[in-house]
Structure formats: structure tokens, C-alpha cells
């Protein structure tokens, strides 16, 4: 009997259920696992509870979670304590009515309770379903309803208000639990509302046997996690991920990372855990390597992230491109306010460091000047950012411009692109440690497959993906599942690109984002937008328009200050924009000032010239921008143009600024 065959005859959680197909839309079904003949794809599968148990057995006294406790201190939970919390929460969920294959929704910022809820739901043979805190009540209802949620855990009274508003529309929902004070009035007045402290102190001895039976029935090839797509077209789809989808992807990520030291890794958790990349890295990968999670506070993306990084000094960091751009803007502002000698030294050091990477492609050249720059200047820069111990800086969720990568290379900080989807449990390709990778998303993870179909004359086509990390199907949505996942288990990503002779994958756009002009030309918007932004640092967003139009136009937003409380863009120009405006010989301090001046002719011409420079880099006349306009404020999450991971919602922007767009074609 093979090792895999033996998994069908053992108790859970590390067991397999018999299955007839590789895909399903039923949350109660199991799926077949596509085992490879050798390599990582042939390794024995493991469940999420099995992964945690193995780490607890070997590293039980190591720190697992650190939460801010007061102004400067942190409360630490070890892996043994973490597991004990998970068991308590799992039993409490069962006592509150959680049935097998039903979900627990979590509507909260990153915190230890998020982790306990996710692991607790999975250990109880339920399903974890994350919900973005920025979701409206209607969007929350969609997730809870479609995921068959029986319990929801929320962050605070604001989120509980959303639940209360839709509670009557959710007959399956049995309990709503609030983590933080001040507590909503419903917790005292109405049944079915609980404080988190009640979950931790609940007497669960009467469900002990039931819990152990549940845990023994957990199977590696059944659904344990639902991740919801962005919903840019229609309602978000629920991506069903099995234990093996997640734990196999985790193995691939760890194998691809540089110098992993089990028991010594640390990560700052700040990207929304509802996003597949954050959940896979923070909850599951960190547990796999017995790493320590440091929780950033709610305002991390509003300016407090650096403080958390300084406290944690992480060994790995994952960000979206906009986070790195914010770091860059801050560093540029600080540098411009320095004295002339400091500026000169910093400029020299950055030039030497960038040259080292561009010449050596990231391999240590041992150059004397590089060593001096690294030890005297770059070490201080890294320390100021909290990156003095970091081994991997990864960028995910959207393409990063080569210019931003070069800026960080000049600081001796190498950012590697990682690519994945909700449907691939988070990661499919990653740049290897020995590659600078300015224009690539890296190589396919070990044990996974990539191919490009429907190629054009240049060898560019649609990326298709196969491997044990590819999802089970969309919950209760057979049509969309069969559209995305073919009979040979290839996932059709919708991403366009190519692979070079060394195996490095590059993406050029998404098929759904491609603009088709009235003349039938296919235009990749992101490349053109990034080219325009590269030509003028004061531009925050360039949004290309031209679907079924005779020519291309672009909506421009300028970099401005941000309200630290709400996260909304202010009218006041950022330092970078102010320096640019002054260089033009005008004294405008706000976007309103610029627009009220006509718009300001000098500002207008500067943007126009930047677009002309970008147009010179176009491969055809059809890809040249003919007109533009300046929008009254920058894009943001609160104003609706950006999603939770700071990606532009293209359909939303097109609707919000429909009048401005029509004027460009009048």
C-alpha cells in the first residue's frame, strides 16, 4: 500500500476522503488530489490542523503571536498557547451551533482573534470566510449568505452595526461575536450576540467528544477556506480552497524563499487577512516555519506601519506596490529636506548600490565602494525603516513599476515580485533570490505548472496554471467554475504574458482589462499608465480610457496629503507635488488652486509634456494618449476608487467619472 493509499484508512485530520473529481462547487464534497510522480508535488499532503500540531510538537514554546500591549509593550502567545486558544474557540463555535461544512465569517482588522477564529473554524471542520472591513452591509450579507455562515466574528461596534442591519435576512446565522470594546448595545438586549471574552471563558466540556469526532473527520481534500474575489464584474465569487491547496502552496513558498530558518522568522501582519496572499503567508506559512507574527494597528496603511516594522524588525515583508510607493515618497521627502552634504552622500551611496545590483544582477560583487555605502549609509536607512533584518521583500496583488524597484535597489533593498490568485491559494510564481527581476514575476513555484495558450505572433498568450494549489471550484457556481477550470485541471487565469527561455514569467495585462478601441486595437492599460507616471513623479494615478472610442484619454490624479484618521485624500499637495509646482514658478498649494486657475497653464503643460514623452515610447499610434484631465482628488479606499489591497477598481472609476470622461470625447 502506498503512502497516499494509507491516508484513506486513517483518522483525521491528516486523512483523505474518497473523491470522484478534481473540481466541485459543493462545499461538502472532497476532490481528488493531482499528485506528481516526484519532487514537492509528490510529497505527502497535510491538513491545516496537522500543520499547526506539527509545529506545536516541535516548537511549542516559541513565540507565535505578538499583540501591542500599551504604548511600547507587546503581549506574546506561544505556539502551545495558540493551539490551546484554537481548541477553546473551536469548541465554543460548536456549542454556538456551528455545523460541519458551514462557515465562520470574520469581519475584522488583523488581530490574534482573527487567527483563532480561522483555525478554530477549520479545526471544528467548518470553513473560514474572511470579509473586508470596508465592505458595505449588502456586501457583507452576500458573503455570509453565499458561504452558509452560522457564526460571524466582528471587530467593533461599527462592524456589528452592519450585522445588526442585515440579521433578519440571514436565517442561518446563529451567533455574532464582537472582539473589541466599546460593545454594541445589542450584546445585552438581544439573543445571539456575544463578547469575545465570553467565547474564551465558555464552559465547553459538554462538546469535548463532539469536537474530537469532528477533528478525526477532517480531510485534507475538503474545503476549509473561502476567499472572495474582488467582484469588479458582478458579485464576488467564493473560491473554495482545500487543506491541500493551502498547505501545498505554503510548501512551495517556503522552498522558493531565501535562507529560511525555522523558529526564527518574523512577519508584520497588516494587509487584510480576507485577501488570499495575506492569509496564506500570515496564518499558514508563518505557522509552517514556526515564525512569529507581529500585529500592526488599524492605522498601518495610514502612516503607522513603519513604527510596527521598527518594533518587529521582520525577516520577511510583503506589500502591495502602493505601500512601497508610499515608503518611497516618504524617503524622497526626508532626503529633500536634508543638508547639502547629506544629500550628496546619500546620492553617491544610492548610485553605487544601484550600479552594483544592475551589473551583478543581485550577486555580491564585493566591490569596495559598495561595501562602504552599504555599511555606512544603507544600514542606517534599513534600520530607520525596520528592515535591517529583512531577507525577503515581496510585492504582490498588482504589478510594480521597474522605477520603484530600482529606487529600493539603490537603498540595498531588493523587492521580488510574487504572483498568484485567490484561485491558487495565494502564490504561483516568485522571483528567486539571485534575480533582480525588474520586469518579471519570477519562476513558477516548485511542483506547479504554467503554460500560455492562444499565443500571438510575439509568443504572448493567456497564462494557464496547474498544480495541487489550484482551487476546488467556486461555491455553488458551476458555470463560472467550468469557465475557469477546464477538464484537464488547467486554471485559465485571464492574465496575458509570456515566459522566456530561462523560465521567467512576465505579464503584460489582463484580458478583462484590455481596452479595445473603436478601430479594433487591443491596448494594455497598465503599461501605458505606468509609463506616464514614470515621466512625472507628482502623478499619483493615471487611468487610461478608450474602450470602443476613437482615441485614448487619461484621467490624472496628483499626489496629495492624506487624512490620518479617515485615510481620505486631502486637497493639500504632497511634498513631492509642491516641489514640482514650485519648480514651474507657481505657488499653488492645493489641487483646487490648480483647477481654479484655469487649470493652471504651467501645470497643464508640464503634465502634457510628460504624456508626450510617454507617447514617444508607444509601439503604435493607437497606443498614444490624445487628451487628459485632472481629477479633483486622488484615488483612495474611502472614496471608492481603490480596493482593500489598493488596486484600482476600473469599473468603479469609469462610472464615478463618467461625466469627465465624456467631456474628453465631446
UniProtKB/Swiss-Prot annotation:
Mediates activation of long-chain fatty acids for both synthesis of cellular lipids, and degradation via beta-oxidation. Probably by regulating lipid storage and catabolism, plays a role in neuronal function. InterPro entries: AMP-dep_synth/lig_dom, ANL_N_sf. It comes from the Eukaryota. This is Very long-chain-fatty-acid--CoA ligase bubblegum. GO terms for biological process: fatty acid metabolic process; long-chain fatty acid biosynthetic process; long-chain fatty acid metabolic process; neuron cellular homeostasis; positive regulation of circadian sleep/wake cycle, sleep; response to endoplasmic reticulum stress. Keywords: ATP-binding, Fatty acid metabolism, Ligase, Lipid metabolism, Nucleotide-binding. ATP binds at residues 229-237, 417-422, 495, 510, 624. Its EC number is 6.2.1.3. The gene is bgm. It is an enzyme of class 6 (ligase). Belongs to the ATP-dependent AMP-binding enzyme family. Bubblegum subfamily. Disruption phenotype: Adult neurodegeneration, with marked dilation of photoreceptor axons. Results in degeneration of lamina and retina, defects in the fenestrated basement membrane and ommatidial disarray. The phenotype is exacerbated in constant light conditions and improves in total darkness. Effects are probably due to elevated levels of very long chain fatty acids (VLCFAs). Feeding the fly mutant with glyceryl trioleate oil or medium-chain fatty acids, blocks the accumulation of excess VLCFAs as well as development of the pathology. GO terms for molecular function: ATP binding; long-chain fatty acid-CoA ligase activity. Pfam families: AMP-binding, AMP-binding_C_3. It catalyses: a long-chain fatty acid + ATP + CoA = a long-chain fatty acyl-CoA + AMP + diphosphate. GO terms for cellular component: cytoplasm.
Amino acid at each position: 500500500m502506498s503512502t497516499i493509499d494509507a491516508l484513506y484508512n486513517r483518522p483525521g485530520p491528516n486523512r483523505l476522503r474518497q473523491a470522484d473529481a478534481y473540481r466541485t462547487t459543493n462545499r461538502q464534497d472532497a476532490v481528488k488530489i493531482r499528485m506528481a510522480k516526484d519532487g514537492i508535488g509528490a510529497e505527502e499532503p497535510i491538513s491545516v490542523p496537522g500543520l499547526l500540531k506539527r509545529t506545536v510538537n516541535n516548537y511549542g514554546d516559541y513565540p507565535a503571536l505578538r499583540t501591542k500591549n500599551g504604548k511600547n509593550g507587546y503581549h506574546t502567545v506561544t505556539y502551545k498557547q495558540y493551539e490551546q486558544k484554537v481548541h477553546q474557540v473551536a469548541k465554543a463555535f460548536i456549542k454556538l451551533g456551528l455545523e460541519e461544512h458551514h462557515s465562520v465569517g470574520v469581519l475584522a482588522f488583523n488581530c490574534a482573534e482573527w487567527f483563532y477564529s480561522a483555525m478554530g473554524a477549520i479545526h471544528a471542520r467548518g470553513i473560514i470566510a474572511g470579509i473586508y472591513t470596508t465592505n458595505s452591509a449588502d456586501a457583507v450579507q452576500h458573503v455570509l449568505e453565499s458561504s452558509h455562515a452560522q457564526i460571524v466574528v466582528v471587530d467593533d461596534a461599527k462592524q456589528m452595526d452592519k450585522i445588526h442591519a442585515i440579521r433578519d435576512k440571514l436565517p442561518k446565522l446563529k451567533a455574532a461575536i464582537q472582539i473589541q470594546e466599546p460593545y454594541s448595545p445589542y450584546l445585552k438586549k438581544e439573543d445571539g450576540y456575544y463578547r469575545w471574552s465570553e467565547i474564551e471563558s465558555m464552559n465547553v466540556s459538554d462538546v469535548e467528544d463532539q469536537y474530537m469526532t469532528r477533528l478525526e473527520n477532517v480531510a485534507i481534500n475538503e474545503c476549509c477556506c473561502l476567499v472572495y474575489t474582488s467582484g469588479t464584474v458582478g458579485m464576488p465569487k467564493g473560491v473554495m480552497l482545500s487543506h491541500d491547496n493551502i498547505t501545498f502552496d505554503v510548501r512551495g513558498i517556503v522552498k522558493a524563499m531565501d535562507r529560511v530558518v525555522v523558529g526564527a522568522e518574523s512577519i508584520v501582519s497588516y494587509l487584510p487577512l480576507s485577501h488570499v496572499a495575506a492569509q496564506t503567508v500570515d496564518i499558514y506559512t508563518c505557522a509552517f516555519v514556526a515564525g512569529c507574527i507581529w500585529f500592526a494597528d488599524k492605522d498601518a496603511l495610514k502612516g503607522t506601519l513603519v513604527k510596527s516594522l521598527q518594533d518587529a524588525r521582520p525577516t520577511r515583508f510583503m506589500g502591495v506596490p502602493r505601500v512601497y510607493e508610499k515608503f518611497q515618497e516618504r524617503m524622497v521627502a526626508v532626503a529633500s529636506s536634508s543638508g547639502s552634504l547629506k544629500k550628496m552622500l546619500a546620492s553617491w551611496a544610492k548610485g553605487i548600490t544601484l550600479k552594483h545590483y544592475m551589473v551583478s544582477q543581485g550577486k555580491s560583487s564585493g566591490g569596495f565602494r559598495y561595501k562602504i555605502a552599504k555599511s555606512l549609509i544603507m544600514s542606517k536607512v534599513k534600520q530607520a525603516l525596520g528592515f535591517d533584518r529583512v531577507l525577503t521583500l515581496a510585492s504582490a496583488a498588482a504589478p510594480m513599476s521597474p522605477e520603484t524597484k530600482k529606487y529600493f535597489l539603490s537603498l540595498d533593498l531588493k523587492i521580488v515580485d510574487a504572483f498568484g490568485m485567490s484561485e491558487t491559494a495565494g502564490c504561483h510564481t516568485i522571483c528567486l533570490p539571485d534575480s533582480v527581476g525588474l520586469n518579471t514575476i519570477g519562476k513558477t513555484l516548485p511542483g506547479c505548472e504554467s503554460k500560455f495558450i492562444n499565443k500571438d505572433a510575439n509568443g504572448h498568450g493567456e497564462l494557464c496554471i496547474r498544480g495541487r494549489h489550484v482551487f476546488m471550484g467556486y461555491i455553488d457556481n458551476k458555470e463560472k467554475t467550468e469557465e475557469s477550470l477546464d477538464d484537464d485541471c488547467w486554471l485559465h487565469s485571464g492574465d496575458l504574458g509570456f515566459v522566456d527561455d530561462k523560465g521567467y514569467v512576465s505579464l503584460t495585462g489582463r484580458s478583462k482589462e484590455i481596452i479595445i478601441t473603436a478601430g479594433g486595437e487591443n491596448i494594455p492599460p497598465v503599461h501605458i499608465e505606468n509609463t506616464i507616471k514614470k515621466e512625472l513623479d507628482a502623478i499619483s494615478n493615471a487611468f487610461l480610457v478608450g474602450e470602443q472610442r476613437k482615441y485614448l484619454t487619461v484621467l490624472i490624479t496628483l499626489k496629495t496629503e492624506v487624512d490620518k484618521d479617515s485615510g481620505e485624500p486631502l486637497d493639500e499637495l504632497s511634498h513631492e507635488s509642491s516641489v514640482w509646482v514650485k519648480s514651474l514658478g507657481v505657488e499653488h498649494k492645493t489641487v483646487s488652486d490648480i483647477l481654479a486657475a484655469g487649470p493652471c497653464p504651467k501645470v497643464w503643460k508640464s503634465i502634457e509634456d510628460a504624456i508626450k514623452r510617454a507617447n514617444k515610447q508607444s509601439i503604435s499610434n493607437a497606443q498614444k494618449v490624445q487628451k487628459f484631465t485632472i481629477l479633483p482628488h486622488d484615488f483612495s479606499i474611502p472614496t471608492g476608487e481603490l480596493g482593500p489591497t489598493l488596486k484600482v477598481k476600473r469599473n468603479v472609476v469609469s462610472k464615478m467619472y463618467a461625466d469627465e470622461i465624456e467631456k474628453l470625447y465631446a
